[in-house]
Amino acid sequence: MNKITNASRFLFEELVSRIQERSKAVGIAVAIVDRNGNTQYEKFFGYRDQERKLPIDEDTIFGLASVTKSFVALSIMQLVEAGKVDLDDPVSKYIPEFTNRNQKPIKVWHFLCHTAGFYPMHRTIINEIAQKAGLDENETGDFAFCEKIALEGTKAVAELLDAQTKENGGLIGDPGNYMSYCNDGFGLLSEIVRRVGGENSFAEYVKKHILEPLHMERSSGEYVCKTGSGCECGNSLQNAKRCHDLRQRLP
């Protein structure tokens, strides 16, 4: 690995600062790790909690957001390796709620590669599912480990995707031919993991089959960070104004 010089460090940090300003990011953590697992560079910009002026540091826990898809993909491939899932199987084999009506079968690998053919659509949000189902996290426990949420969410996602697979052709093209990013496709994949993997929730599967074997003790599939755990506060922009979301899911 090329050595990081003072000049390159300065240019890099200037770039990160510009990105932070342009994106209105409250805080950013950056690290460069070599192939041997040695940290060659780390730097923390801004706050994990802007209101309380708590800075980001090496112990700050971030939500993984869409990097969660990597855990979904790894889980699916573990089940493929175990002979429990076939990438060429139609998704409807594992998720019969997804009828995939009047279209060529959408297979497991299509969702993994974002090539199922769906147009971008409203993302299914767990809080919306809970509200419609009349579920309270104080009663059910963490939503990430709640079977009822998984079932209700699967039903909602399947209906949403099925609405595009109509006789008049609601897809971008035949499955496998076009790339179109699909969050909800990975939602159905995570449900395949839950149903086939033998755990009560996708989060529990990841905990037992990925995080614990790798000794990732500060990582979890929890939907909301526990207070005081060093989590970064979720932030979003609405009408160019910053607002707080729920505390981020633990990575």
Task: Give the residues covered by each predicted segment.
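Penicillin-binding protein/beta-lactamase superfamily catalytic region
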Residues: 165, 179, 193, 197-200, ...
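Stable alpha-helical elements in mature extracytoplasmic
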Residues: 8, 12, 87, 104, ...
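Active-site-proximal loop and beta-strand segments within enzyme catalytic domains
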Residues: 49-183, 200
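Proline-centered turn/helix-capping motifs that create local helix->coil transitions or kinks
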Residues: 120-123, 218-222
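Short, conserved catalytic-motif segment at the N-terminal edge
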Residues: 4-64, 84-86, 162-170, 223-227
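Loop/turn elements at helix/coil->beta-strand transitions in domains of secreted/extracellular proteins
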Residues: 25-28, 36, 106-109, 217-218
